Amino acid sequence: MGFRSFLHRLTAPKFQRYVHGDQSLKMVFVINHELKMGKGKIAAQVGHAAVKATLKSGEARPELLDAWLSTGQKKICVKADDARLIEQIEQEAKQHNVLSSKIHDAGHTQIPAGSLTVLALGPDENEKLDALTGELKLF
């Protein structure tokens, strides 16, 4: 899907709201707490993850993206102790057919280049994402 098509789908009036069964949908951001990023840095990294996950979902699962966009775009941030745990969660997400998007920092400011900062999961059903991240504390 091209960028113009994606923008059109986001901004065009919806004549019919999509419903994904009886399931509520959300996107989860798993933040690497080990890096001790500042609040602004975290906000920027989560922003990158949100955009990347939304674009990926638009290509891979557009019906799920449409349902999420039309039902409030719920987003949750949780913290992981380190990059190893984030990688483990990503592998579990793949096994459960949950879309994931990793963000690695460019290294221009607070943290070393290539550091895994955030993992975005979804959008997907609450229950599927809770099974992957339900044990993590809210950020």
Language-model region placement:
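Intrinsic disorder/low-complexity detector
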Residues: 1-37
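Short basic, glycine-rich beta-strand/loop surfaces that mediate nucleic-acid
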Residues: 2-7, 29-30, 69-81, 94-139
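Glycine- and Gly-Pro-enriched alpha-helical subdomains that act as flexible
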Residues: 22-28, 32-60
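Conserved active-site and cofactor/substrate-binding residues in soluble primary-metabolism enzymes
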Residues: 41, 45, 81-84, 127
